[in-house]
């Protein structure tokens, strides 16, 4: 049996998910494929892109400390989350082929988790495990077993397989029609070469800062903090307050972007994506990582030079490394891609929508 799971792109809603905010994300064409079958033993045998096979004993599903940060943890964690929800977990073999570079920003870990979930769904549960359940199981695998403080956006986009508007406070999940091409725009990503691997602490710091602000106002997350109270009753840590301000403003931009997409409003889409990008750079500050890798920063700067006045550009996903996302006039895309490739390597810039 062959199973495909797409990668994902975050269109708007940068670091809003873990504060129960809103986001628009979309599945993208690059993804992962597994050729799989049942096995007689209660083990998962997985070989990815021809590398050395991995074997996981599925009779032992508790988190294993030494597996944190590894693919083994994702396999075990996905099986654990499914079994906890009453689904059948059985042995399988899977040959995986991936078009998603690990740490490149298209959510390779989320796609892999969902892929493993789809394998177990198809082989042992009649393909009946719904996308939202697969996404929640994938989040649990990443958070508990892998040790990554992930939200739910990546997993939902990979599992649902199309553009989707998500409100994490209300659990509203609305599939969207996303046609930038009809607006004369091309959505693309440039992989700057930096990796998301090893950036867990940078991501965790954003979450800590936002949670510190929400706790100051007696709430668990920023979504339930009154914005007027936030503005009038100053939080003393200026750095954390800036990140909170990003959340409040970004969370209001998401439904505006959704409306602009629905009515085919080219200028609106460019405006809201640019506002999101500048807020991430200046307030959220997830462009340069603590390790000092500045390739993403250079990608943002080059995109600004190339697209100012005609397109939109922003950090993609978690940030600190990885990809620059851009909405480029379709008749200018070839020139933009050529310039980005010249700086970051052949085929580093690719059209995704």
Predicted segments — roles?
Residues 1-22, 68-181, 307, 332-338, ...:
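Gly/Ser-rich oxyanion-binding loop with an adjacent helix/lid
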Residues 1-8, 12, 33-70, 165-314, ...:
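C-terminal nucleotide
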Residues 20-40, 160:
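Structural signature of FAD isoalloxazine-binding scaffolds in flavoprotein oxidoreductases
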Residues 24-25, 312-318:
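Short, flexible, solvent-exposed loop/turn segments with mixed acidic/basic and small polar residues
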Residues 24-26, 156, 324:
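His/acidic/aromatic-lined binding-pocket segments of jelly-roll/cupin-type domains
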Residues 318-325:
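N-terminal pre-core extensions flanking Radical SAM catalytic domains
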């Amino acid at each position: 049996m062959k199973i495909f799971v797409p990668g994902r792109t975050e269109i708007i809603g940068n670091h809003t998910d873990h504060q129960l905010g809103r986001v628009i994300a979309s599945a993208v064409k690059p993804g992962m494929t597994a050729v799989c079958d049942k096995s007689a033993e209660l083990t998962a045998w997985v070989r990815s892109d021809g590398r050395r096979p991995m074997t996981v004993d599925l009779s032992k599903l508790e988190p294993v400390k030494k597996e944190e940060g590894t693919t083994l943890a994702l396999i075990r964690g996905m099986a654990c989350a499914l079994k906890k929800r009453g689904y059948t977990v059985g042995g399988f073999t899977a040959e995986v082929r991936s078009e998603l570079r690990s740490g490149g920003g298209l959510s390779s870990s989320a796609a892999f988790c969902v892929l493993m979930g789809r394998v177990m769904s198809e082989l042992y549960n009649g393909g009946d495990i719904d996308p939202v359940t697969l996404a929640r199981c994938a989040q649990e695998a990443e958070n508990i077993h892998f040790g990554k403080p992930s939200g739910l956006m990546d997993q939902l986009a990979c599992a649902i397989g199309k553009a989707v508007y998500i409100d994490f406070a209300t659990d509203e999940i609305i599939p969207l029609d996303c046609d930038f091409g009809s607006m004369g725009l091309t959505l693309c990503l440039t992989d700057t070469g930096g990796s998301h691997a090893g950036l867990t602490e940078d991501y965790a710091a954003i979450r800590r800062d936002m949670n510190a602000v929400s706790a100051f106002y007696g709430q668990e997350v920023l979504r339930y903090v009154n914005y007027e109270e936030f503005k009038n009753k100053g939080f003393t840590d200026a750095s954390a307050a800036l990140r909170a301000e990003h959340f409040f403003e970004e969370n209001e931009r998401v439904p505006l972007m959704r409306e602009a997409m629905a009515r085919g409003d080219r200028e609106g889409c460019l405006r809201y994506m640019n506002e999101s990008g500048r807020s991430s750079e200046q307030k959220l500050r997830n462009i340069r990582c603590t390790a000092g890798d500045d390739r993403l920063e250079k990608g943002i700067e080059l995109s600004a030079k190339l697209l100012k006045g005609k397109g939109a550009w922003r950090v993609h996903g978690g940030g600190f490394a990885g990809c620059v996302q851009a909405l480029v006039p379709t008749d200018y895309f070839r020139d933009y891609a050529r310039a980005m490739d010249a700086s970051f390597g052949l085929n580093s810039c690719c059209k995704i929508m």
